[in-house]
From Swiss-Prot:
The keyword Zinc belongs to this UniProt entry's keyword annotation: yes
SUPFAM superfamilies membership: beta-beta-alpha zinc fingers
Encoding gene per record: GLI2
Disulfide bridges in this chain: none
Gene3D superfamilies on file: Classic Zinc Finger
GO terms of molecular function: DNA-binding transcription factor activity; DNA-binding transcription factor activity, RNA polymerase II-specific; promoter-specific chromatin binding; RNA polymerase II cis-regulatory region sequence-specific DNA binding; sequence-specific DNA binding; zinc ion binding
InterPro entries recorded: GLI-like, Znf-C2H2_ZIC1-5/GLI1-3-like, Znf_C2H2_sf, Znf_C2H2_type
Name by which UniProt lists this protein: Zinc finger protein GLI2
Length: 663
């Protein structure tokens, strides 16, 4: 519409008085215009753009409103910047109070010049058929601070509809902010509307603060999970005690001195309504820590400045301190994952959730099928759903149901528990075997454990065989020496031959050399002995290499079998001396027993049993006074390669009839 008209600046400079032209030229010259921070240097550098307003009919176009709201109005050209009017919210027309200091006139306009400018504006109004906005002189007082508001350009229809809606509060507010009020009411309304919209913008710092609060809660959720609710108890509720105190410290001192340290033998909590139900603790310090649940004592306080956290358990304080130091000692054990955590519970939770779908922690409450990836979630579930009284301890877990797949750190404990259960299952067999042997032997002192410890002999070979002995499958297992040890050396392996044993046994404790001998009066006949000799003599060559510590060849001579039934004679017949000093601990009665054994070798009714009554010993007691696996007398060497006691010997068998003990 106005594209064909010449610029306002050209018209003002061509038609006007000398004074007015001089003053206008001062403001419109390129030198003065360069004072403003506008991208356009002179008015001639850019042509006036055609107005682009929302689609309206020609009859309804209000040129005055269009010019006032247009950013390309005359005043905008004089200021040479559309941003100045837009930033101040004046939408193209000048309001002296809204002009920022950067875009104000360099010096105030005197009244004479102001009247000349008004005259020029009236001449322009006759040419265009409307009255342009009046130019207000700039204020003489120092310019106020520039108010930053968001530029909003609503359509003109909205401006006209809101032009008459001005409240008293908004007018008073604008009058206090602006030194020179605007001549147009929609201007004040628009400024108020812009400020209202600015104030009504969504507040972003609030969600940010909530997010920080969530992070803080996540940081402290694990360190407080085992801490009970805040309790401050000053009265003693111990069983039979009703003392009252003023402070918590006095109550704690009373409990520790009078109740806990007073009962040194058993560590039981006798507090009223305690969910532990007087189950004893293993140590005193555990009871001291437990009592903090009742008293509310939290002696472990955070040492960082400004932090008032306190905990009843030292472990929880250490975990909390990592939130200050940033320490994360628990690294994910999965290959390729370098994530670290401040506590083990978070690491277990991460590993089970991220690297596997395993939920090994099962709720033990009957009827509940909940499973969790970490122990802290299970404890929280039990406490919140089933109540604090439903807490399941480690000891109770073994009694109710088989435990879930254990953690890695508990694997060794589980294995040891299983092994001990196996030993307990084998012990009844050993007990039954011992009962079946009561007609053959009587034991005075038993200090041995269920399993016999296998120790190495001086030759480097074990004195207890870990291989299955073929003696268990023979028909005549009447030896008093052969003892097959499987792994742990259970006594149940002796069942095959001890029930038919016509010998006198000796029991040797692991710490003491105690020999208790009771000879059986009723022995088997010589015929049975001769039969055993014939059956066992065939393999004795391969099992006699242990007589001397030095290795011997296969041409070792067998001891001769005498006609009187004694098979314990050595071919040399020379007496041997016991080099072990622990043999000095034998009592006089035991020496007498040994003499009786030597006398029974001449008897035709004696058996081979008496020769080995003191020889069944572990090599840990004496390497020279140990049991023979395949003796020359019993000759139970069905194994060609017997690995038992290859470097030890029996002083009874090697000494022959003239067995001497040098004291």
């Amino acid at each position: 519409l106005m594209a064909g008209h010449p610029n306002y600046g050209d018209i003002l400079m061509q038609s006007g008085g000398a004074a007015g032209t001089a003053h206008l030229h001062e403001y419109l010259s390129p030198v003065d215009v360069s004072r403003f921070s506008s991208p356009r240097v002179t008015p001639r550098l850019s042509r006036k753009r055609a107005l682009s307003i929302s689609p309206l009919s020609d009859a309804s176009i209000d040129l005055q409103t269009m010019i006032r709201t247009s950013p390309n109005s005359l005043v905008a050209y004089i200021n040479n910047s559309r941003s100045s009017s837009a930033a101040s919210g004046s939408y193209g027309h000048l309001s002296a109070g809204t002009i920022s200091p950067a875009f104000s006139f360099p010096h105030p306009i005197n009244p004479v010049t102001y009247q000349q400018i008004l005259t020029q504006q009236r001449g322009l109004s006759s040419a265009f058929g409307h009255t342009p906005p009046l130019i207000q002189p700039s204020p003489t007082f120092p310019p106020r601070q520039h108010m930053a508001v968001i530029s909003v350009n609503p359509p003109p229809a909205q401006i006209s509809s809101n032009s008459n809606c001005i409240s008293d509060s908004s007018q008073s507010k604008q009058s206090s902010e602006s030194a020179v009020s605007s001549t147009v009411n929609p201007v004040i309304n628009k400024r108020t509307k812009v400020k209202t919209e600015v104030e009504g913008l969504p507040q972003y710092p609030q969600p940010r603060q909530e997010h920080l609060t969530d992070l803080k809660e996540d940081l402290d959720k694990d360190e407080c999970k085992q801490e009970p609710e805040v309790i401050y108890e000053t009265n003693c509720h111990w069983e039979g005690c009703t003392k009252e105190y003023d402070t918590q410290e006095q109550l704690v001192h009373h409990i520790n001195n009078d109740h806990i340290h007073g009962e040194k033998k058993e560590f039981v909590c006798r507090w009223q309504d305690c969910t532990r139900e007087q189950k004893p603790f293993k140590a005193q310090y555990m009871l001291v820590v437990h009592m903090r649940r009742h008293t509310g004592e939290k002696p472990h306080k955070c040492t960082f400045e400004g932090c008032s956290k306190a905990y009843s358990r030292l472990e929880n304080l250490k975990t909390h301190l990592r939130s200050h130091t940033g320490e994360k000692p628990y690294v994910c054990e999965h290959e390729g994952c370098n994530k670290a955590f401040s506590n083990a519970s978070d690491r277990a939770k991460h590993q089970n959730r991220t690297h596997s779908n395993e939920k090994p922690y099962v709720c033990k409450i009957p009827g509940c099928t909940k499973r969790y990836t970490d122990p802290s979630s299970l404890r929280k579930h039990v406490k919140t759903v089933h109540g604090p009284d439903a807490h399941v301890t480690k000891k109770q877990r073994n009694d109710v149901h088989p435990r879930p797949p254990p953690l890695k750190e508990n694997g060794d404990n589980e294995a040891s528990a299983k092994q001990s259960s196996k030993v307990s299952e084998e012990s009844p067999e050993a007990n039954s075997t011992t009962r079946s042997m009561e007609d053959c032997l009587q034991v005075k002192t038993i200090k041995t454990e269920n399993s016999v410890m296998c120790q190495s002999s001086p030759g480097g070979q074990s004195s207890c065989s870990s291989e299955p002995s073929p003696l268990g499958s023979t028909n005549n297992n009447d030896s008093g020496v052969e003892m097959n040890m499987h792994g742990g050396g259970s006594l149940g392996d002796l069942t095959g031959w001890m029930t038919r044993l016509p010998v006198v046994d000796s029991t040797v404790s692991s710490g003491n050399l105690t020999v208790s001998l009771q000879l059986r009066k009723h022995m088997t006949t010589m015929q049975r002995l001769e039969q055993l000799k014939k059956e066992k003599l065939k393999t004795v060559k391969d099992s006699c290499s242990w007589v001397n510590p030095a290795p011997q060849g296969r041409n070792t001579k067998l001891p001769p079998i005498s006609g009187n039934g004694s098979i314990l004679e050595n071919s040399g017949g020379s007496s041997r001396t016991l080099p072990n000093p622990r043999i000095m601990e034998l009592s006089v009665n035991e020496v007498t027993m040994l003499n009786q054994i030597n006398e029974r070798r001449d008897s035709t009714t004696s058996t081979i049993s008496s020769a080995y009554t003191v020889s069944r010993r572990s090599s840990g007691i004496s390497p020279y006074f140990s049991s023979r696996r395949s003796s020359e007398a019993s000759q139970l060497g069905h194994r060609p390669n017997n690995t038992s006691s290859a470097d030890s010997y029996d002083p009874i068998s090697t000494g022959g009839r003239e067995f001497d003990i040098k004291l």
